[in-house]
UniProtKB/Swiss-Prot annotation:
Alphabetized Pfam families for the sequence: Ribosomal_L5, Ribosomal_L5_C
Main subcellular localisation: plastid
Coiled-coil blocks: none
Function: Binds 5S rRNA, forms part of the central protuberance of the 50S subunit.
Compartments it resides in: Plastid, Chloroplast
Subunit-level organization: Part of the 50S ribosomal subunit; contacts the 5S rRNA.
Keywords per UniProt: Chloroplast, Plastid, Ribonucleoprotein, Ribosomal protein, RNA-binding, rRNA-binding
Protein name in the entry: Large ribosomal subunit protein uL5c
């Protein structure tokens, strides 16, 4: 599964981007560095089961066990204390990254209700793309009967692109379904 997207990048996308942006060297062509999947869990401080179920879901989705993020300092307004779990994060690189990206493009995004494409405006100015999903049910690994609550997650696709236009071209050529705006 991961071989398809990685091979497509190496064979067709690299040469296409090199011609489009007039790069002198193949190593100048933008590539993927990592994909970060993050889920904030505000209720994890009161509900340990929410943390465990989220860890299990993200492990199923990514194939890698997430890291538990903890609060750096206490904030009374948010009712959190220092070192209390407040979220989970997974960093995907190399083959797992390409496998997840292929699954996201071909299986997951088309399962979103009334899906017309993702926004091309979610770039950060340096060629990295951020995507927020409202529910985990769109992933094929998640069974509807086994979830306790619908939770969203954030996906950051980090590239070596210098500008948003380069990042957009890279993702479009790999088949990311962007909305026409």
């Amino acid at each position: 599964m991961a071989i398809g997207l990685k091979e497509k990048y190496k064979t067709t996308v690299t040469q296409s981007l090199k011609d489009e942006f007039q790069y002198k060297n193949v190593h100048e062509v933008p590539r993927f560095t990592k994909i970060t999947i993050n889920r904030g869990l505000g209720e994890a401080s009161q509900n340990a089961k929410a943390l465990e179920s989220s860890i299990q879901e993200l492990t199923l989705i990514t194939g890698q066990k997430p890291i538990v993020t903890k609060a750096k300092k206490s904030i009374a307004g948010f009712k959190i204390r220092e070192e209390v779990p407040i979220g989970i994060v997974v960093h995907l690189r190399k083959d797992k990254m390409y496998s997840f990206l292929e699954k996201l493009i071909n299986l997951t995004l088309p399962r979103i209700r009334d899906f017309r494409g993702i926004s091309p405006r979610s770039f950060d100015g340096k060629g990295n793309y951020n995507l927020g999903l409202r529910e985990q049910l769109i992933f094929p690994e998640i069974d509807y009967d086994n979830i306790d609550q619908i939770r969203g997650l954030d996906i950051s696709i980090v590239t070596t692109a210098k500008t948003d236009q380069e990042g957009l071209a890279l993702l479009k050529k790999l088949g990311m379904p962007f909305r026409e705006s």
